[in-house]
C-alpha cells in the first residue's frame, strides 16, 4: 500500500502501541490540521511536514517569521535519505550513536513543504525515540514538524502546564498523553552537516 494513503485497519495491526488518542491525532494531521504533542525534548506544535498550508498555520500560530525554518521529526534513520539530497557517510554514525536528542542540519532537503526548508535549502531533521512522537511519525507515514509550543521570542514551555492558553486554543487537537509530567527536558543538540562530511556543532 502506498504511504500516501492512511489505512486505519493496517495501522491497527502494526506492532507498536496504538491508542485512540494517537489515532485521533493522525486523523487531524491527515486532514491538514495542527496538533500539540509531547516529543523527545519539549512539548511541540506539529503538522504534516509535507503540507505547505499546514506548515503555514504553524508559523501563524507561533507568530514566527517564515524565514526561520523548523525541525522535522522522523521515527527511523533509514527514512532520512527520502528527505535529503545527499547524506554523507558520517551522518549515519552521528545519528546512530547519539546518546541524547540530536538534530542534524543537512545541506539540501527534498520532498518536504517548501516552507519547512531553510532559505539556503537546508533542512533540520531529528530521529525521535520518544514513544508518542515516534508512533505519530510511524502512523502518519510522513515526517512531522516539531517546533516548541510557545510564541516566537518567548521561552519554550518545558512542561504541558507552561503552555499558554492562546497556543492551546489555536491548535486543532491536543494529544492527552504525558501531560502530568513535571521533569524539565533539555532542547536537542544541533549539528550542521556539510556534504563533504565536515560538521559544526551549533548547540
Located regions from the model:
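Active-site-adjacent structural elements in enzyme catalytic cores
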Residues: 2-203
